[in-house]
Swiss-Prot record:
Family: Belongs to the dCTP deaminase family.
Active-site residues annotated for this sequence: E137 (proton donor/acceptor)
Entry protein name: dCTP deaminase
GO BP: dUMP biosynthetic process; dUTP biosynthetic process; nucleobase-containing small molecule interconversion
Pathway(s) this gene product operates in, as recorded in its UniProt entry: Pyrimidine metabolism; dUMP biosynthesis; dUMP from dCTP (dUTP route): step 1/2
A Pfam match: DCD
Gene Ontology molecular-function annotations: dCTP deaminase activity; nucleotide binding
Gene responsible for this protein: dcd
């Protein structure tokens, strides 16, 4: 299994729609000034989060149960900057829509800009033939409020291609998050 380069990412996105919308290079500035970088890097793709957030709250004194998740545990928020309360988390989604090839497994890692501020990004692997917008989880590990900037870089996707095609892909299994759009809560 080998990691794929910027040339491969560019070709797969421009010719096969692997990432849409796609940024062929690194963007570090916008009309608003400096931004946290996004777009194609040497061996990965830095994704942006949209301006759609679900901020965790415990006003209902609920128990977090992944098999019976209560949507009321979140406050919906739309805006350019999301403020995550201390020791809490928020969900968001990527601006980009992904179509992962059958021979590829994609791993997501947080950007150092956020990690150095105590903000951790968590995403499970994007499996072969999965497609959709990626739901992102931001954990604020600090005891201070933390900011997440919409439409700026938040995490990096790394693409690994196997030397052998898998027998059963995510699509073949009818995975429950296939084709997801928007911020998607846990499903069982």
């Amino acid at each position: 299994m080998s990691i794929k380069s910027d040339k491969w990412i560019r070709r797969m996105s421009e010719q096969h729609g692997m990432i849409e919308p796609f940024e062929a290079g690194q963007v570090r500035e916008s009309e608003k000034g400096r931004v946290i970088s996004y777009g194609t890097s040497s061996y990965g793709y830095d994704v942006r989060c949209s301006n759609e957030f679900k901020i965790f709250t415990n006003v209902h004194s609920a128990t977090v149960d992944p098999k019976n998740f209560d949507e009321n545990s979140f406050v919906n928020y739309t805006g350019d900057v999301c403020i995550i309360p201390p020791n809490s988390f928020a969900l968001a989604r990527t601006v980009e829509y992904f179509r992962i090839p059958r021979s590829v497994l994609t791993i997501c890692l947080g950007k150092s800009t956020y990690a150095r501020c105590g903000i951790i990004v968590n995403v499970t692997p994007l499996e072969p033939e999965w497609e959709g917008q990626v739901t992102l989880e931001f954990s604020n590990t600090t005891n201070l409020p933390a900011k997440i900037y919409a439409n700026e870089g938040v995490a990096q996707m790394l693409f690994f291609e196997s030397d052998e095609i898998c027998e059963t892909s995510y699509k073949d299994r009818g995975g429950k998050y296939l084709g997801q759009t928007g911020v998607t809560l846990p499903r069982t």
